[in-house]
Regions:
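Positively charged, solvent-exposed patches that mediate nucleic-acid binding
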Residues: 1-123
Length: 123
């Protein structure tokens, strides 16, 4: 379970991150990362939100995918910059993959997002 201060809750945060954040995708999920650039971050810790649509499966399957993603992010939240907002969107393929494959795809997406964000800040 993610700490409460690391959970994205407000629809405004989701909307802003999905519209303005950098996007990177993998086979089972895609991510949107928004850094608090040029302004004071609203919080010192990164916030993570999850989007798992009905296309992924039934409510039981969607909740299982969210639980798996939350558990994987719990160990990786420290690698995110403070004050950033991250939205992870699960693809339908996420329901049928092993935990190790989902973890590898998450690492791939996070690596791409962080490289793109650092590159954008340098410009």
């Amino acid at each position: 379970m993610l700490p409460q201060q690391s959970r994205m809750r407000s629809p405004e945060e989701f909307k802003r991150t999905l519209r303005s954040g950098r996007r990177a995708g993998g086979a089972t999920l895609s991510g949107h990362l928004l850094l608090a650039s040029g302004q004071v971050p609203t919080c010192a810790v990164p916030k993570v939100g999850f989007v798992v649509s009905r296309a992924v499966g039934s409510a039981v399957v969607r909740n299982r995918v969210k639980r798996r993603l939350r558990e994987l992010m719990r160990g990786r939240i420290a690698s995110l910059p403070g004050g950033c907002l991250l939205v992870l969107r699960a693809h339908p393929a996420a329901a049928g993959v092993r935990q190790a494959d989902l973890a590898a795809d998450l690492d791939l997406v996070l690596g791409r997002l962080l490289r793109r964000q650092v590159g954008a800040l340098r410009q």
